[in-house]
Amino acid sequence: MEFDTIPQEAMWQMNLRSSETMESGPYPEHPGEPDCSYYIRTGLCRFGATCRFNHPPNRKLAIATARMKGEFPERLGQPECQYYLKTGTCKFGATCRFHHPKDKAGVAGRVALNILGYPLRPNESERAYYLRTGQCKFGNTCKFHHPQPSNMVLSMRGSTVYPTVQSPTTPGQQSYAAGITNWSSSSYVPSPRWQGPSSYAPLILPQGVVSVPGWSTYGGQMGSESPQQTMRNDQTYGTSHQGELENAGLQGAYSQYRSGSVPVGFYALQRDNIFPERPDQPECQFYMKTGDCKFGAVCRFHHPRERQIPAPDCVLSPIGLPLRPGEPLCVFYSRYGICKFGPSCKFDHPMGIFTYNVASPLADTPGRRLLGSSSGTAALSLSSEGLVESGTAKPRRLSLSETRPIPPGDDNIDDEG
């Protein structure tokens, strides 16, 4: 009987004490002592008036004050807060149940930073997104490795991205600084990737198409013109200008074009090779064709530094693109004036498709002449509706893949008007 009664009384007393201590009530305030973490977290304290820690009346204000001051609880005997060791802060504040030593605040996160402000962690794996773009949204708190960007391509918006090019003039003529009137700013060719005004520096070129080593990823031969030809930009080169063409040194079968009307086929800069070299892996076919790779440093194929470019099997235009009269027209080139495949492209890249008549205003010219014929045959014009054959009785629209034979020896371009 007594044996059954004692445990029941003890249990009743324990329950009573538990209910009494868990009730909210006045708890002792010890301003010089640390705050009671259990009280701060729950508003209750099982020790009641015998607790030796501080119990501030306004718990929310105490939590906010602790976070603002950077004061975090020190709990000797408890595991150290890893987030506190890395960053020097703790989102749980005074309610965190781990140990926060003041002398180790952020000591684990004190790593060396690269020139862009990202952490260098040689023992960790490299951040793939950073290797491709040069940016990392996690900043200096990222746990991955961010190597120095010495071999990376950085987006330098608003800076001069093209090197200074010397004008192909006579030795006695002034250089770029004094002879800026002999230069022209070549506008960018419209592209679906270039929407709106560009914040990049404009491409400065002289009146002739200048060959600059390293600008293009393929070895095309680009011609330049003599000072006599620079003064005659309002004329179209034909068979009567053979003497001037010989002095200018233009090469290729379609060199009788006004150089001021020739678009630049490639906007590429000479840069360090950022693509990985993996001799034991197959070669990246896209890189071998274009010299670029969208996967960057994370590509698993081989990217040889010295790319063996096969010799072209056709005549190249002055901007280094293949001339294949019997093949369909390169659609991308016909729209934007560039071709990423360079001399390895299997389509035709005629030069006359982008020849403008600078003698008359562009507003008076509804279309652009395309490989006109002096023998009275139908000529093609490139208008807003596409390719139109305008020399016939009824103009008809042509597809970009349709080709028409060019009479032999007829490689002149007729000025419109």
UniProtKB/Swiss-Prot annotation:
Start and end residues of each stretch annotated as Disordered: 383-417
GO CC terms in record: nucleus
Domain of life: Eukaryota
Subcellular location: Nucleus
MF-aspect GO terms: DNA binding; mRNA binding; zinc ion binding
Stored InterPro entries: Plant_ZF_CCCH, Znf_CCCH, Znf_CCCH_sf
Gene3D superfamilies for this protein: 2.30.30.1190, Zinc finger, CCCH-type
UniProtKB keywords: DNA-binding, Metal-binding, Nucleus, Repeat, Zinc, Zinc-finger
Disulphide bond pairs: none
Keyword Cytoplasm assigned: no
Main location group: nucleus
Zinc finger (C3H1-type) residue numbers: 31-58, 75-103, 121-149, 278-306, 324-352
Xref: Pfam families: zf-CCCH
PANTHER family, sorted: PROTEIN PHOSPHATASE RELATED, ZINC FINGER CCCH DOMAIN-CONTAINING PROTEIN 33-RELATED
Protein name: Zinc finger CCCH domain-containing protein ZFN-like
Species for this entry: Pisum sativum (Garden pea)
